[in-house]
Every structure is written in C-alpha cells, then in structure tokens.
A protein has these predicted regions:
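A conserved active-site cap/scaffold subdomain adjacent to cofactor or substrate pockets
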Residues: 254-306
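Hydrophobic beta-strand scaffold residues
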Residues: 32, 56, 124-126, 281
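NAD(P)+-binding Rossmann beta1-loop-alpha1 motif at the extreme N-terminus of oxidoreductases
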Residues: 2-72, 97, 134-137
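Conserved dinucleotide-binding and phosphotransfer motif residues
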Residues: 28, 121, 277
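Rossmann-fold dinucleotide-binding core
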Residues: 84-86, 107-220, 227-256, 293-306
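Short acidic alpha-helix initiation/capping motifs at coil-to-helix transition points
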Residues: 20, 43, 195-198, 261-268
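Rossmann-fold NAD(P) dinucleotide-binding segment
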Residues: 59-126
Length: 306
C-alpha cells in the first residue's frame, strides 16, 4: 500500500481494544492509521491488519500527516494523565475543524475541562463511552458520544457503521449531548453493571450457602435464566464460569480463586455523583462497598480468627 494514501481515522493506543476497533473500522471501509509508543504493539497491529488499508505510524506527527481533512482521531489510552499528555503533544499538530475523540473510561468532568481548554482553537472534542469489551470492539460496540455538537456530523457515519445493532436494526450509537454527557452516560452504565454483578454474586451465595447447591448446579440455574427474560452477557458468562473446572484438581475453578475483586472507579464515581445530585442509587453504592470489603482480604481473614 502506498504510504501517501490519505487515511480516514487516526487511532492512538493499540492495545486489544484499539486493535479490535481498528479492524472493525477497516471492515466497514475506513482506513486506519494507528500509533502506540510501544513498538511491539505497532508491530502486532501491522501483523493483524496485513492485507488491509491500515498501517502503523512511528510518531504522532506521522499519524496526523497521514489523515484526510478534517482529521478524525480516536484516543484509546488510559484515562487521566495519559490523555492530557497525548493532547498536549497533538494540539500543535492539529487545525481548526479537526476532531478528537476520547474513547477511554474518562471522568465526565475531565472531558468537560478538556473541551473548555480547546475553546477558541477550532479543534472539536468528543468524550465517548465504549461498551462491549474486546469482542464488542471487534464485532460491534455500543457507543456514547458527547461533547462539541459540531463534531457529530463529521464522525456519525463512521461511528454508527461500526456500532452494534439493536433489535430494530438501529445502531447502538447516538448523540448523548454537550460537554461530558457521553462519558457521564458510560459512567452510569458501568455503575449499573456494578449493581448487576453484585446481585449475581449474591444469588450465587444464596444458592451455595442457603440451598447447598454445587457450582455445577448453580451454573445450570444461571443457564436456565439466560434462556429467558433474564438473558444477558453477564448471566451467560457466569453460567460458563461456574461450569469451568480446575484442570489440576478437577473441582470447580470458582472454589480455587482468591475471593477478592478490584475496581476501576466508575462505580465509585456513579455513587458519588448520585449523592451530589440527591439521586437514590443504593444498590450501586452497596455494590461498590461490597468490592471494597472484598479487597480487604487480609483484614477479613484476620477478623475471622480473632
């Protein structure tokens, strides 16, 4: 492929999510120029996209120069300081009318701050929630864009083309609103997921401790639930997990794992904002506290012995 071909989209951050999104865009006819500081990730990207229009770039300047105007650049980097660092390096390379999209799990107020910082530059900024994990990124995520309204017509066709489809065939991608609206919606989405996972965990505990069911029997219950109105990704993978056995001992793998759960912060943010707004979200808050207690495994073990 000629390296002078104008590319449709720049993608910064070539982890699994970024890679899979790039393949999804390519499948829908959008040529992707990718960049990552990690040379190994760039090499893997070139390997996975061999035969496609996509290619990696060795610098942000090369990536920006490869894009057709107005430039559209999607950031898939860790939320926080990494986003600010990329923006600081990108800003001098961009022109009025270019569009930046932050696809990470960014706090919505950080997105609003970045939009304000770009006011007057003509650079358009979007904060976009991306849901569906690695498989969703590859086959069809749910996308929640918000920010500069002027950017939406410039990116809507490509974003809606790669998004998952609802039962009525409408794309799972629509404009959420100004400022940090897109990331706010994703934050609440993740908070609800915290509550869902806590309810699944408590259902498992009740069946195991109160009813005496084995993990295999509980798996069968979850599989039955997944065939009805409770059917969902989380219920389905729970059934699969509970049916998995440890190859070394033959017993249920769930009985061999450490009983601690980490968290990335979106559930906490949702709970904090609910308190600020006076919105009742006790199930989400309790799910966050349950994870906090879960993470205190040494303290729990000590307390159980004294």
């Amino acid at each position: 492929m000629s390296t002078t071909q104008a590319m449709s989209l720049g993608l910064i951050g070539l982890g699994v999510m970024g890679e899979n999104l790039a393949l999804n865009f390519e499948r829908h006819g959008f040529a992707v120029a990718g960049f990552d500081l990690d040379a190994d990730k760039r090499a893997r990207f070139d390997e996975r996209t061999q035969g496609l229009q996509a290619r990696s770039c060795t610098s942000l300047a090369e990536l920006v120069a490869s894009l057709s105007a107005p430039r559209r650049i999607l950031l898939m980097v860790p939320a926080g300081a990494a986003v600010d660092a990329v923006l600081a390096e990108l800003r001098p390379l961009l022109s009025a009318g270019d569009v930046l999209i932050d696809g990470g799990n960014t706090l919505y107020s950080d997105t609003a701050r970045r939009i304000a910082a770009l006011q007057g530059s003509g650079i358009l900024y979007l904060g976009m929630g991306v849901s569906g994990g690695e498989e969703g990124a590859l086959h069809g995520p749910a996308l929640m864009p918000g920010g500069d309204a002027a950017a939406w017509p410039l990116v809507a066709p490509m974003l809606q083309s790669i998004a998952a489809r609802a039962d009525d065939s409408e794309p799972c991608c629509e404009w959420m609103g100004p400022g940090g609206a897109g990331h706010f919606v994703k934050m609440v989405h993740n908070g609800i997921e915290y509550a869902d996972m806590q309810m699944i965990g408590e259902a498992y505990w009740l069946m195991q401790e109160m009813m005496g069911l084995s993990p295999a029997q509980i798996s069968a219950v979850f599989r039955e639930w997944n065939a009805g109105e409770l059917g969902s990704y989380l219920i389905g993978i729970t059934a699969d997990i509970l049916a998995t056995t440890d190859p070394l001992t033959g017993e249920a793998l769930v009985l061999r794992i450490l009983d601690t759960a980490a968290q990335k912060g979106t559930g906490k943010w949702t709970s904090q904002i609910a308190l600020d707004l006076g919105a009742a979200a006790p199930t989400i808050a309790d799910a966050v506290f349950a994870r906090t207690v879960s993470a205190l495994q040494p303290e729990r073990v000590h307390a159980s012995k004294h």
